[in-house]
């Protein structure tokens, strides 16, 4: 049985017309190497607490109580801004202009060829990953608290930045509801044709203990198909059915149950690092995934308007990164559930288009909803 946190339920029951309980505060987090101040924002509704910083539009932390009422941070990351400046694993970050991979770091648009930095080489095969060498995760955004008790972060990516055409104006909004939903919404416009796939890249361990693996977490994905890849983790262009394979999470499944299976996709990715094609739903967002930790009782549902979700199982975490409270983040100590457009979409005409043109608005809606299960 899934139940929201009790105190919030009581508040809603007794005062259905009351204003949101969410409070938002800000303070100086530190300084960039050039001396520019960086803010950190705290959103809390009395049960859930989220922190967001202007650097990288990063979700710094997310705390919720377990079934015994003990709160813990469920995310990987760093204690200080100085730590975040070394963030090479995209912990908590807003990544773009194009999240995920682009084959060979090349694409063509309206008859013109573009070359991006190749900053990733799975299987020894170079590709462009998560926007480039200095993507959205490594720049300073301008933040403010809105009248709606949300945090809005703005960044203008110049024409030609990291090789992408067009000046792109991006607004990212983080908000926290009384229903224990953390919402992340992106809106972007351009002054010239470009490609866009902006992704939220938080690493989750619902146990609240970053020294444990997520292999005992239970995952459900609202997807009947996934994108097989080549040795460089670039989609082949096919959509394969998950039925009868270790990629089938249509029913709640322990993540580590089939990691050792003799299956090509798992061998190529060193585990799970693939995009699943989501079933379409009604409304602005639809159910994408549910993650549950049996030990703590914590559950997280994911809703989005995007066509795919990437499950990255933390396969390349190696125990060398010193994170929060001195924790060493080992292999599979957290996972990412990245709602997204299809990887390498600019080079695959049969994939949903990632092209954004002047006069259009790119929108990515993502909701993480937290609850407890007995």
Predicted regions and their residues:
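Bacterial Sec-dependent signal peptides at the C-terminal "C-region" and cleavage site
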Residues: 4, 8-20
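An exposed, glycine/acidic-rich loop-and-rim segment of catalytic or binding clefts
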Residues: 18-374
């Amino acid at each position: 049985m899934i139940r929201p946190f009790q105190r919030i339920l009581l508040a809603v029951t007794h005062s259905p017309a009351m204003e949101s309980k969410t409070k938002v505060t800000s303070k100086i987090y530190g300084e960039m190497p050039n001396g520019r101040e960086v803010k950190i924002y705290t959103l809390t509704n009395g049960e859930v607490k989220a922190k967001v910083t202007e650097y990288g539009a990063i979700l710094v932390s997310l705390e919720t109580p377990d079934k015994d009422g003990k709160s813990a941070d469920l995310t990987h990351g760093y204690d200080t801004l100085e730590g975040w400046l070394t963030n090479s694993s995209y912990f908590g970050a807003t990544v773009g202009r194009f999240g995920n991979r682009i084959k060979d770091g090349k694409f063509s648009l309206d008859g013109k060829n573009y070359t991006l930095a190749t900053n990733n080489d799975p299987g020894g095969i170079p590709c462009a990953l998560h926007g480039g060498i200095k993507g959205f995760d490594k720049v300073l955004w301008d933040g403010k608290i809105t009248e709606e008790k949300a945090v809005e972060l703005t960044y203008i990516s110049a024409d030609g930045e990291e090789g992408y055409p067009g000046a792109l104006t991006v607004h990212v909004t983080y908000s926290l509801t009384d229903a224990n939903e953390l919402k992340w919404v992106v809106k972007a416009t351009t002054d010239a044709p470009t490609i866009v796939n902006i992704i939220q890249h938080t690493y989750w361990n619902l146990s609240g203990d970053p020294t444990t693996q997520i292999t005992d977490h239970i995952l459900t994905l609202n997807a009947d198909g996934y994108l097989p890849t080549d040795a460089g983790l670039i989609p082949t262009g096919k959509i394969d059915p998950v039925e009868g394979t270790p990629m089938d999470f249509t029913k709640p499944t322990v993540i580590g149950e089939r990691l050792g299976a003799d299956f090509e996709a798992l061998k190529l990715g060193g585990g799970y690092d693939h995009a699943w094609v989501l079933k379409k739903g009604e409304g602005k967002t639809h159910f994408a995934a549910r993650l549950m930790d049996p030990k703590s009782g914590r559950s997280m549902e994911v809703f989005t308007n995007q066509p795919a979700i990437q499950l990255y199982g933390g396969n390349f975490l190696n125990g060398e990164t010193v994170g929060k409270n001195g924790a060493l983040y080992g292999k599979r100590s957290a996972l990412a559930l990245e709602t997204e457009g299809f990887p390498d979409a600019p080079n695959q005409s049969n994939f949903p288009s990632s092209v954004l043109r002047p006069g259009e608005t790119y929108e990515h809606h993502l909701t993480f909803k937290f609850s407890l299960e007995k």
